[in-house]
């Protein structure tokens, strides 16, 4: 789990010099650390064992004077600092929520429209709404006529008054608290909506047809009109079964899909999830997807035996193309863990996949996530959180990250960075192997921001201490103070530090 060096170069604003001091590998840490208190150095990371910890490097010497420019600290990308919150978004949003950030103060949620006072779970009957008389309303950030609704912090725009089509609807927010309903965005046959992306001013809304099969797509250039966009038909021909796909656009404009692959598992016995996730890429996100190596592959040993399972929807929903509900899979042993209902996001070049986590042994389902420094590399397991079948999605909004599920509890996080890290750098100015001047102790941390034109690519500013006031010297030393200030299991785990020098 390494941060891409290429991205670090970008955030420095210049090329890493050969003379820069980088502590990255397990060997680097062992060779350069002078003392560690309240932490352990394991597998190339410094992990606190107490609430507070300190790390001091040895003095890095040189034969000529050098001026330090900056210190950058990278943490483990495991991203465990999530905080539970009550249901995110409209209270009457049904089924799996789909999130889409168009830009600052422009956040969207898609789901089924329920005429009930609480979000219903898939398969549950909605409670009938009481009698209500709508009244005109005003809301900051909206210049269209609005009406009140029986749901708290929710309003109807003109598009929201148009009749439903049986598919997903759109709600918009400027603050992730108040939501304006703009009406349908997919037809009834597209009720199994799984993901959305933003491409050149248009929303790509992906859905399975039939359920758990080939991803199709609506392209919508007007989310406000209460009318579904243009149905472009099948986007990805699923070579297996499973879909429940998540889509993400890279910075070159290519669209990637992460898709469930049920070929190694009896999915009906494992919450319709799988240990295997396929990955395909397309230039436009509408067609031409080419499959790559799997994004997730936690299969156990294949037995060579073939089993079958039954799906309830294929023949019913698409009898033209599906003559049977029976599918085959290769039996694997021992029992496998299963993942699915994928959602993707990229933070400063580090990719994350969030999805269902159904552990082996019949334990409680939860949200699980994986990470990789490249969308083209296999993802590594991070952790899990919550309870129940989540069907999650993730978005960046209002300066933080929101993880929405179809359960009663959602989650929010300031980002992968875990507070608190304080740093100072010292310099030996007279070549006596002693530090003559230190900087003040300064708290450093990463920050995150939108990238114009991209919904799921998030910019990262590194945790950096600028050292322009430090004089030239023959030796430099780094000291770090770590304090676990969170109320969850996360802690500031150091993975890499870089002391850059002026040329």
Identify the function of each model-found stretch.
Residues 322-371, 404-418:
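Loop/turn-rich, solvent-exposed surfaces of beta-rich toroidal or solenoidal domains
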Residues 19-90, 122, 397-399, 405-503:
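Beta-strand-rich ligand- or partner-binding modules
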Residues 70, 95-116, 136-160, 182-187, ...:
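Hydrophobic core segments of beta-strands in well-ordered, beta-rich domains
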Residues 92-94, 189-191, 240-242, 337-339, ...:
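Loop/turn position at the start of each blade in beta-propeller repeats
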Residues 117-132, 163-169, 212-220, 265-279, ...:
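Structural motif
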Residues 79-88, 176-187, 223-238, 284-334, ...:
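Blade-edge beta-strand/turn elements of extracellular beta-propeller
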Residues 76-83, 87, 110-180:
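Beta-propeller domains
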């Amino acid at each position: 789990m390494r941060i891409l060096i290429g991205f670090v170069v970008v955030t420095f604003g210049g090329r890493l010099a050969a003379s820069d001091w980088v502590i990255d590998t397990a060997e680097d840490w062992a060779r350069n650390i002078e003392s560690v208190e309240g932490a352990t150095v394991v597998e190339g990371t410094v992990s606190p064992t107490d609430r507070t910890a300190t790390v001091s490097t040895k003095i890095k010497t040189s034969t000529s004077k050098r001026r330090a420019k900056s210190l950058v600290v990278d943490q483990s990308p495991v991203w465990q600092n999530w905080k539970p919150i009550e249901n995110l978004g409209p209270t009457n949003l049904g089924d799996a929520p789909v999130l889409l950030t168009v830009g600052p103060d422009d956040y969207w949620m898609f789901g089924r429209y329920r005429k009930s006072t609480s979000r219903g779970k898939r398969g549950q009957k909605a409670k009938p709404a009481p009698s209500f008389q709508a009244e005109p309303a005003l809301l900051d950030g909206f210049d269209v006529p609005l009406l009140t609704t029986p749901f708290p912090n929710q309003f109807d725009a003109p598009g929201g008054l148009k009749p439903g089509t049986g598919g997903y609807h759109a709600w918009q927010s400027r603050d992730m608290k108040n939501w304006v309903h703009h009406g349908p965005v997919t037809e009834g046959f597209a009720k199994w909506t799984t993901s959305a992306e933003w491409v050149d001013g248009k929303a790509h809304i992906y859905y399975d047809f039939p359920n758990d099969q080939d991803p199709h797509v609506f392209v919508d250039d007007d989310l406000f009109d209460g009318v579904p966009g243009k149905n472009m038909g099948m986007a990805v021909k699923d070579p297996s079964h499973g879909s429940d796909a998540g889509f993400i656009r890279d910075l070159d404009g290519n669209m990637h899909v992460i898709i469930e692959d049920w070929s190694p598992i009896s999915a009906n016995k494992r919450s319709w999830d799988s240990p295997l996730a396929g990955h395909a890429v397309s230039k436009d996100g509408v067609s031409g997807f080419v499959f790559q190596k799997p994004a997730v592959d936690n299969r156990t040993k294949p037995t060579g035996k073939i089993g079958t399972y039954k799906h309830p929807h294929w023949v019913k929903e698409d009898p033209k193309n599906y003559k049977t509900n029976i599918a085959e899979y290769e039996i694997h042993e021992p029992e496998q863990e299963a993942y699915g209902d994928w959602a993707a996001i990229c933070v400063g070049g580090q990719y994350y996949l969030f999805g269902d986590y159904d552990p082996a042994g019949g334990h409680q389902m939860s949200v699980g996530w994986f990470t990789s420094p490249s969308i083209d590399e296999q993802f590594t397991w991070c952790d899990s959180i919550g309870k129940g079948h989540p069907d999650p999605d993730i978005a960046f909004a209002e300066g933080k990250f929101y993880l929405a599920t179809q359960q009663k509890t959602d989650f929010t996080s300031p980002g992968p960075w875990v507070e608190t890290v304080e740093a100072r750098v010292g310099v030996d100015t007279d070549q006596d192997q002693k530090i003559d001047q230190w900087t003040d102790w300064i708290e450093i941390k990463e920050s995150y921001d939108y990238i114009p034109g991209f919904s799921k690519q998030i910019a990262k500013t590194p945790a950096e201490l600028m050292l322009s006031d430090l004089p030239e010297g023959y030796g430099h030393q780094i000291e770090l103070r770590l304090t676990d200030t969170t109320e969850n299991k996360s802690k500031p785990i150091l993975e890499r530090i870089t002391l850059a020098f002026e040329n």
